[in-house]
Amino acid sequence: MRKIGIIGGTFDPPHNGHLLIANEVYHALGLEEVWFLPNQVPPHKQGRNITSVKSRLNMLQIAIEEEAYFSICLEELDREGPSYTYDTMVQLTEKYPDVQFHFIIGGDMVEYLPKWYNIEKLLKLVTFVGVARPGYTLHTPYDIVKVEIPEFAVSSSLLRERYMTKKTCKYLLPEKVQVYIERNGLYES
């Protein structure tokens, strides 16, 4: 069976923390690939102003282009409405029956797992991989794989805030993504 990691998110914008997490889990678990799964409308972010799918997808393609074992999974972008991980993983496990999926989540989402839609059924479809994030523990009633990674405290919301207040984002996200953001006037106040 093939082992593939999935890291879901809004990627608004994608940053070096996303890449670090994907790379560390890839090596720690001996995965064949890591798929980045951009979501249409994450249930926990409904009502928030999110950058267009086209721009988020372009930035993500730019961010991962140098790693052969990184790719983008468009499953959630092909659907309208809220993106529930359970629905996506039902589709992916039917489409790829020879794959053992490892769903990578940060410490913030580990604590939130009991509230995930159809969590009991989802646990039968994927192995959750929890990575530590500053300010969060990896405590959950569920069986998850824990992977320690170097601490890198950056988030997409921090980057959006820094762009809006005209602070530098150098070394926090890939340089080519930074160029794309600036050329397209994203995150300006």
Swiss-Prot record:
Pathway: Cofactor biosynthesis; NAD(+) biosynthesis; deamido-NAD(+) from nicotinate D-ribonucleotide: step 1/1
EC number: 2.7.7.18
Keywords noted in UniProt: ATP-binding, NAD, Nucleotide-binding, Nucleotidyltransferase, Pyridine nucleotide biosynthesis, Transferase
SUPFAM superfamilies, alphabetized: Nucleotidylyl transferase
GO biological process, one term: NAD biosynthetic process
GO molecular function terms noted in the UniProt entry: ATP binding; nicotinate-nucleotide adenylyltransferase activity
Catalysed reactions, semicolon-separated: nicotinate beta-D-ribonucleotide + ATP + H(+) = deamido-NAD(+) + diphosphate
Keyword Repeat: no
Gene3D superfamilies in UniProt: HUPs
Domain of life of the source: Bacteria
Function: Catalyzes the reversible adenylation of nicotinate mononucleotide (NaMN) to nicotinic acid adenine dinucleotide (NaAD).
Similarity comment: family membership: Belongs to the NadD family.
Protein name: Probable nicotinate-nucleotide adenylyltransferase
Organism: Bacillus mycoides (strain KBAB4)
Gene this protein is translated from: nadD
